[in-house]
Each structure stands twice: as C-alpha cells, then as structure tokens.
C-alpha cells in the first residue's frame, strides 16, 4: 500500500503541480483559495501550491518508499488493520480518482479560489522528504472513503490534496501526518490540514516557520499520518495533502493541501478533529509538521473538538475522551461543525536547500510562524475573509524572504529563530486576530488558537497564538504522540498532548517568563514516557481544559505516553533545548524560543503546572498500563512514533527516546512523573528502542531520511542511499557534517549522553553498512574480475585452438580489450582492497589502468601472443602458402582481376568465425591481395611478412580453406 500510495502521490502530485517533479524551477502560483468546498464545505485551498523543487525525484522514490513502508507500518499499528486495509483498498482507486480529481480539482479549485478571491499561494518550503506526499495520499485516500458525504464534495480537492499530501506528507507528514495519525479519523484531513490548515493562512508563515522544521517534525507526523489515514477514512473531512517533490535530498517541494472537511462523515475524531485540526493546524503547523500533526491533532481534538463540540454543544473533554476512547462521540461532536471546519489547504513546501537538516531547522522555526499565519489565513479562508489574501501574500513574501534564513542555517535553531521570533510575533498576531475573528468552528479550524473551546479555547487560543512560535519545538514531540494515535486512545491522548503542547508553545511564546512550569511539565512528562513534552503540554492543556476530567486526561496521557514515548524525543528535544538545551540540536535561537514558549506555558498555565505534574504522574502510570495496552494495540504506533522520534530528530529524539526517556527525563521530571516515566518509559523505551531498532533498518532509515527532515537521521538515510547510489563525495561529506553537527549539539545537551549513543549508532551503523556494502562490492568485483581474467586468458587459447590462427588473433585483441576492461575492474577492486576499499560514489580508474598494464605484463598475451600467433600463423601460412601457390596460382588471375577472392576469403572466415574473421576480413582482402600477389613472387616469405604486418594471418587461412573447399 505504501508503495502504491507513493506512486499515486507521485503521479498525482505532478499532475497537480504545474511543474514536473523532475523540473526544478520554483513555481510560485497564486491561485485564489477555494474557500468553498464543492458542496457545503468551505474549501480554503492553498493546497494548490505547486511550488516544486523536484531536485530529488530519484532520492524521493527510495526515501519515499521507505517512508511509505514506515508510514504503512505506523498506519498499521496506529490505525486499525481494517482502516489500513480500507485505506489500501481505497487507495488504488483513490489515487487514480485523485489523479483525475486532482486535475479536476485543480481546475475547480482555482475557480473556487478565484471566486473566493483568496490566493492559493505556492510557498517555497524546505522539504526534505516526500514521504508526506505518500502519507497525504493515504490521507486523501482514506479521507474520501472515510467521509463519503464530505468527501463526495471534497474528493477532487481531496484527491489533489491527498496526492500532494502524499508527496508532502511522507517527509513532512512524517511529523504532520503522524500527528494527523494521532487523530486517526482526521489523519488525512488533519495532518495535512494541520499543515495545510495551519498553512492556509500561515501558508507563507508556515513555509517560513514550516519549511525545514515543519517538515522535520512533519516527518515524525508522517509516521503518525499513516495511522491517521485509517482514521482519516473516518475523518477524511480534514485532509491535508502534502506533496513533497524532493524529499530525500532535503531540498524537496512539499505541497500540502488540507481539506478540513469536518463533516461527521467519519468518526468524531475525523469531524471534530478536522475542525479542530484546522483550528489547531495553524498553531500545530506553527509548532511544526510533527507537532502540527500532534499539536494540531491534540489542539484539534481539544480546540476543534471544543469548537465543534461548542457548536455541537459537546464538552471538549468528551470529544477528547471520545477521541481517545472512541472516535464515534468525537464524530458526533465534529459533525456539528464539520462543514464549517472543512478547510482544504495545500501548502507546497519547497525544499530549496538540498540537505534535510536545513529543512528541519526551517520547519522548527517556521512552524510557529506558519501556525500563526495558518491561524489568520486559515480563519480568513474559513471565515471567507478575503482580506487575508494580501496578508497571505505578505506572508508568502515573508516566507520567501525568510526561507533563505531557514535554508541557510543548517541548524534548526536558525530557522526556528526567524520564524519563531519574527514570524511568530507577526503570525501570532495573525493567529490571535484570526482566533478572535473567525467563527468558532472556523476559528478553531483556521486559527492556531483553540478559541472554540471557551475556557480551553481561550487558553488554547492564546496558547495556539503563541503556540505557533513554540510549536516548532514541540512539533517534534507531537509527531511521535501522533504516531501513538494509531490507537484511538493514543489518538485521543496524542490529540490532547498535541493540544497541550500547542497551548504550551503558544503560552510559551506569549510569556517567556514562565519557563519553569513548561519545563516541569516537560520534564515530568518527558520522564513519563519521553513523551513528557507532549504530556506536559497535554497536562497543562488538560489542566486547563480537562482539569475536571483528569481521568480522561490520564487516559489521554496514557495514550499519549506511548505516543509521547515515541514523540517525547522531539518534545524533549524542544523542552530539553529550552530547559537544558540537551536534546534539541537546533541553534540557540531555537532554544531561546523553546525557553520562551516554556515561560509562556508556565505563565499561561501556572495553575496547570501541578495539574500537568499530577497528570503526568497518573498518565505516566496509566501510560505504563495504557502504554502497554497501547503497546499491544499501538506498540507499532509507539514504535513508529519512537522511530519517528528517533529518526526525525536523531539527536534530540534519539536522546529522548533511546537514552533520555528513562534516565535523563526521569531525572528531569518530578519524582512522581519520573517514577511513572521510568515505569512507562521503561516499557515504552523497550518499545521505542526495540521498535526503533526494528524499524530503524526498514523504517527508521526511511523515517530519518524523510520524516523528520532532521539532518542527522535524514542525512544518515540519505548518506546510505547516496552512498549506494554513488553520490559525489562532497554531498556525502556535507551529510556527514550534518550528521556530526547534531551529535555535537546533542553532546552539549544534558540528554546528549544517552542520546548521542543512539544518534551515533545511526551514523555509525550507516557507515558500517556502507563499508560492508563497499566491501561486498569489492569482493564481487574482485571475484568477477578474477573469473573474467581467468576466462579471458582461457578464451584466447580456446579461440586459438578452435579457430586456429584466425580466431586467436582477432579474439586476442578482443580478449585483450575485454581483459583491459576486466583488468580495470579487477585492478580497481584489487587496488581498492589493497590500498583502500571502494568508497560509495567514488570510482578510481587510475589504479585500474596500472593493473591493466600489470595484467598485460603478466599475461603477455598482447605482445607475445600476437607474435607467437603470427609466427605460428606464419608457419601455417608458409605451409599453406606453399600449397597456395599451387592452388591459388590458378585462382590468382581471379584475385588480380576480381575481388572475389577477398570476398571469398571473407566468406570463408565467416564460416570459420564470423565475428573474428569479419574484423580481419577487411584486412584479409588486403592481405589476400598482397599475399597472393606476393605469393607469386615468394609466397611463403611475403605471405608471412604480410600477415605479420597486417596481423591478420588468420584471414589467409580461411581463404585457403575456402579455395580448397571451392576447388
């Protein structure tokens, strides 16, 4: 299914995007957003961003394949097998339908956008992986089946979105889609929506903030996204279609189309998730693709759920609990405002920088900005406001301007700094405005803030508004928690955690002073499963939202903790970065932003801190208990989320997941949280570590390459792919730098001690694998060369014996040529083995040449063999010539008068050895003529001399034979 999705997304995305994925030109197309869905649903489709940098179509396919596998795995674990099967079954038709639908929707969507007067702006995002594309494809695929009613209206847009999302989602949706997965029903809609919904208004800002980081986080989300698609089938309403053009290289284009079709066509999760995803999307996207997924998902659950449930007069907690316990209640709630919350958003992320890490950096920083922008733009698009168009353009301009900064810095921090600081403020303002302005459902859907839930929404709204800035840090966490959502409870937990995270980031951004509480939450939550960051935001969000319903919160935490365990590394990254700068290798700017968000969170949720702490403790214990159930039901999700975590943020995630989850995080969190964390994280660590290892080779590498756009993992994956693909050394060196840099950053961080080994293991493992592969190649080359060399020498004698002199001379030159080739190969292999093993992508012909000379000397075939053959041939010729004068003398007049003899000689050599004689045949004419003419005078000597000079005595022999046979 994954591969199919990938193919479909790839096919669909090119159709959707004006530029061929192979075409590198950046295409900025401003298309009015389709604010209205084909039917009752509002379609704010910035999803038609066709900015594609198909720099890495080839890389994309391997990475995408891996991502598909991984996302498929994630989907399998998080979404029920039924959902996955449904998604698989639906996908083929979905993809084909989408391809046609995407075209139609592209046609319609531009019209709708034109009608809506909103610009569908193509934003250049730094996208590392096209896994998102596949994930989005799945989302789109599931979305249509999941929400037939809304999908019926939205299928075309969904098809386009899903195709784009599929491309984008793999890399970007790794985080975002996985987050979406946390919203099983919205997965397609939400993860993409979160990206796109967040990106609708903050499309530009998201690109600013979302470019690298969003995708990095999205990569984790991607893992969740596969699970989400299953839910999306239920909650197809919110569809985010991410199209990543150049995932693998990291300079990939990400097209995200988010259709927030919040109709209750699917489970409550889908509906309210869709709506809340849109709402959360802005902030989630702000937070990052990964966080976007989980934050938006959680936010969506909390805020969108609240907004929708508000609209549907349902408690946010109920939606959350419903989401967590059963999507059906959520769907009922979401049904209330699905149409309003339906916002198709497509953001085409352009990965201008080739390395995934820049994408990661940009994503983190830009995510918050995108979130705010998404909030404003999304709310505008949802509200039907046309005024945001200029703001969107300005945002796009800002993104384009800021893209350089995101792309330039390889470290996530620089990108986050720009988007978090500059875009965060502007985006936050936009988000706040949007949150205030748009309808509740639209607000919740479009706004990053969760304004729909009155109290919670206010908190979330403020958190969401600020969340955009902070989310980038949490975005990493969220993808994992959304990976957890594979199971409904995990989904609910992840949603809650995402919401909390989003809120916390928002509050953090809002107030930088209260870093302790977020830190406490973060650490305690981090302790719990290494999901602490997610849990802590979740705790604060729940403390605010679900203070009364802490049991559901605990359940959510439980669910989250599995996912958080998976997603904790990212969250811990951001939190550790802010608090201790341990896990997050983003630059200081990112850590500052994280600190800010933590402060804001603590300020925003001063009273919630105890609640998060307390919640983390029960959630942790529950996480241990529920985590284990989830391990059963969502172990794969957890594993995938952990894999996502480890892969997306190799430094931070791995530290959090692999080493810091239990020890460092346990130490950091409160004692109770740490105790629970040790409990939960211990089981979850086995899951995360074991699963990470298990998934690492198949999924982790792909995940690292595509999902988390983090340089270390992606570079590892990329380096492995590229090394196998014989990619130039400087690229490998750059990748190695990218891999080493995160490790250094992590080593500086507190959790780095534990994290570094995990992270280093990946580069080391990759190196080992590459070395082993190179050694194997060398062995094969040597063996084949040795075989060839032995065969080639043996062949000449055989030819000599078989064709006597005729074949031998011709074969020997040929054999010599072949031997030369083999000698080059063997020499290269032998020289490589002797001096240095073959290095991936490095081919050294020089030693091969030297070996050729050596082989020639050893075999002496070329100089001596010719002379020997010539001498032998001359002897034969002399004998034959002795006979020839008699026979040929009669024929000699014919030779002189006609060219038949040469022709005959050619014919005869053909009989003897067509290929061998043909080559000398041309000479044979000359030799036959000269020889025969000379033969009259002194046949033997002249014939010998002629043959030696021409080097084709064989020809004469065939001629004589031909004459004999003819005579």
Swiss-Prot record:
Region feature Disordered, mapped onto this chain: 132-154, 302-336, 432-462, 506-628, 644-685, 786-838, 929-967
This protein's GO CC annotations: cytosol; nuclear envelope; nuclear lumen; nucleus; PML body; sarcolemma
Polar residues composition bias: residue spans: 508-523, 558-567, 658-685, 800-811, 938-947
Disrupted-gene phenotype: Knockout animals are obtained at the expected Mendelian ratio. They are viable and exhibit normal cardiac function despite myocardial metabolic abnormalities and cardiac-specific overactivation of AKT/mTOR pathways. In aged mutants, cardiac function is depressed with increased left ventricular dimension. They show an impaired capacity to adapt to stress such as hypertrophy induced by isoproterenol (ISO).
Tissue: Predominantly expressed in the heart and skeletal muscle, but detected at lower levels in the lung and brain (at protein level). Also detected in smooth muscle, thymus and kidney. In brain, expressed by a subpopulation of cells within the hippocampus and cortex. In heart, expressed by cardiomyocytes. Expression is reduced in hypertrophic hearts at the transcript level. However, expression in hypertrophic hearts induced by transverse aortic constriction do not differ from control at the protein level.
Entry comment on modification after translation: May be ubiquitinated by UBE3C ubiquitin ligase; ubiquitination is followed by protein degradation.
Biased composition (Basic and acidic residues): 543-556, 958-967
GO MF annotation, one: lamin binding
Induction, per UniProt: Up-regulated by beta-catenin/CTNNB1 in mesenchymal stem cells (at protein level). This up-regulation may proceed through the down-regulation of UBE3C ubiquitin ligase by CTNNB1.
Protein name per Swiss-Prot or TrEMBL: Muscular LMNA-interacting protein
Organism field: Mus musculus (Mouse)
